[in-house]
């Protein structure tokens, strides 16, 4: 399990990619992280390969997503950490060539962008919410994987 600390929290406040109010067209493998982001994609006809959700926004405001996902997985991931269970499930899901999967988080999904970038293949599009700004869209690259590895090394491991 990795625990968030002040140094990494400060780094994570900066978006990893470009922030959009409305996303441009997206091609290839897509992973969405967060309920509002996923709901926006689905309402615009974009079905992510994997959606990571906790059915809340800003930690406690419920979000209704009426979409029926093809395959659903659940893991626990407490606030402020990346659980081993979440890491293993994301690692597994990165190997599946399927669409319309959901990973439902009991806890909080905010930090799970990190293992998604670590384990999903290069050129995967990752979309997550940047609070009060919009959505961040990035393509996984080797350079981004190295940046994520550094963040993981800076986190406390238990």
Curated annotation (Swiss-Prot):
Give the enzyme class: transferase
Q: Which domain of life is it from?
A: Archaea
Catalytic activity reads: 3'-dephospho-CoA + GTP = GDP + CoA + H(+)
A GO molecular function term, named singly, is: GTP binding
Any idea which positions bind GTP?
35-36, 54, 56, 109, 132
Q: Which InterPro entries match?
A: GTP-dep_dephospho-CoA_kin
Pathway noted in the entry: Cofactor biosynthesis; coenzyme A biosynthesis
UniProt keyword list: Coenzyme A biosynthesis, GTP-binding, Kinase, Nucleotide-binding, Transferase
Task: List GO BP terms, alphabetically.
Answer: coenzyme A biosynthetic process
Q: What is its EC number?
A: 2.7.1.237
Q: What family is reported? A: Belongs to the GTP-dependent DPCK family.
- Described function: Catalyzes the GTP-dependent phosphorylation of the 3'-hydroxyl group of dephosphocoenzyme A to form coenzyme A (CoA).
Name of the featured protein: GTP-dependent dephospho-CoA kinase
């Amino acid at each position: 399990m990795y625990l968030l600390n002040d140094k990494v929290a400060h780094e994570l406040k900066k978006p990893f990619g470009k922030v959009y109010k409305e996303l441009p067209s997206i091609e290839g493998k897509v992973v969405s992280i967060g309920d509002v982001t996923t709901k926006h994609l689905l309402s615009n006809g974009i079905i992510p390969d994997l959606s990571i959700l906790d059915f809340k926004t800003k930690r406690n405001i419920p979000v209704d997503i009426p979409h029926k996902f093809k395959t659903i997985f659940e893991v626990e991931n407490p606030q402020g950490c990346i659980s081993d269970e979440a890491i293993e499930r994301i690692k597994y899901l990165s190997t599946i060539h399927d669409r319309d999967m959901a990973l439902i988080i009991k806890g909080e999904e905010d930090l799970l962008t990190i293992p998604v970038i670590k384990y999903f293949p290069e050129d995967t599009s990752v979309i997550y919410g940047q609070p009060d700004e919009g959505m961040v869209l990035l393509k996984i690259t080797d350079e981004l994987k190295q940046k994520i590895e550094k963040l993981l090394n800076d986190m406390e491991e238990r």
